[in-house]
Amino acid sequence: MIWGRMGLAEGEKPRRNNGINLEDNTMRVAVGLILASAMSVALTGAAWSQTSAAKPVAATPAAPAATAAAAAAPATAAPAAAPSAAFPPPPQQAPQPARAACTNPNALGVARTVEIDTTGGPGFGFEHFKELDFLRDKEVVLTFDDGPWPRNTPAVLKALADQCTTGIFFSIGKHATYEPEILKQVYAAGHTIGTHTWSHANLNDKRLSEAQRKEEIEKGISAVKWALGGISPAAFFRFPALQHPPEMVTYLGNRNVAIFSCDIDSFDFKASKPEKVIETVMKKLDSKGKGIILMHDFQKHTAEALPELLNRLKAGGYKIVAMRAKAPVASLPEYDQELMKDIKLPTVSSRPVNSVVTTVSE
């Protein structure tokens, strides 16, 4: 075929050009091209042979390795996808004592009791949370922060008992370790006990790390549990100063702890006298018609104002709603252990004298 293209046409005579035999020259060119073509084919074949041989070596082992790595990756990463799995389930414990039978026929009392499923950390109080509008007109929830505290908390308990009514007490963990007997009185009277951090730190303070914020929450839970003799508090929490850092709201949601804001802030910590507490609460309540009221059993003026405030609530046709958690919140063992480093042993004995000193002879 090459010869037919590069040689003489069929029947053509050889010609000479300037003494050169064109037939001979044509033959030499043709032979050279044939040899060049043969070498090219040989080299190309060798190259294809090397390429074909290299492909199985490079590609075949790589595919199983990649597949194995891909298959192993989800198994390693799976536990991190469910952070709440690290938290213990709610503890099983004896039911809380019921409120004492009411002997006051004119008492404010408790109109209804609601049980809260705290799964996912629902929020209550329209100052921050608008989703769960469960209170009916003229319904009120009484809440008290910062206790327990000598004199003031017992005075609040007496005012509530006199009116056969109840509230939620958000206890500071450190205060609970100072006054465990008072907190036990709160529980024994049938009131709901939530938590309010370990030391009342503002969790929006940028100087606090995330670990420190979590410690404030968790050590507060551990402290209240310790003060109650191993009884876990309700899965209810209120942020100090109503400062809600978003990452801690998420954390409490994973912890299945409900968050409480308020509808009516009494600003009792600013009040110069008991009457001011009553005036502030009733003015806001008459405007809104219902709501969660924020007060402090830590404050002297609140304890003094509460008997008259409860009278005003009854006279105004308001009704008290009791809130309780469907389940308590479990403390975390690492914070239970950490708490033991900070608990201050009581310096005053709570035992009766005759249990300590016994006359054996006279």
Please report, for each region that a protein language model flagged, where it lies by residue:
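Short, Lys/Arg-enriched N-terminal segments with co-localized hydrophobic residues
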Residues: E10-T26
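N-terminal pre-catalytic segment of deacetylase/amide-hydrolase enzymes
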Residues: E23, R28-L33, M39, L43-T143, ...
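Active-site beta->alpha N-cap acidic-glycine motif
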Residues: A101-E210, E216-K225, G229-A234, G289
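Active-site-proximal beta-strand/loop segments in catalytic clefts of secreted hydrolases
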Residues: F144-G147, F170-K174, T197-W198, R238-L242, ...
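Divalent metal-coordination and catalytic microenvironments
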Residues: D145, L160, I193, F237-P240, ...
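Alpha-helical scaffold elements lining the catalytic groove of polysaccharide deacetylases
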Residues: N152, A201-G229, Q243-G289, T302
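Residue-level detector of anion-binding/catalytic polar loops
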Residues: T166, T192, A258, D265, ...
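Catalytic grooves of carbohydrate-active enzymes
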Residues: M282, D286-R324
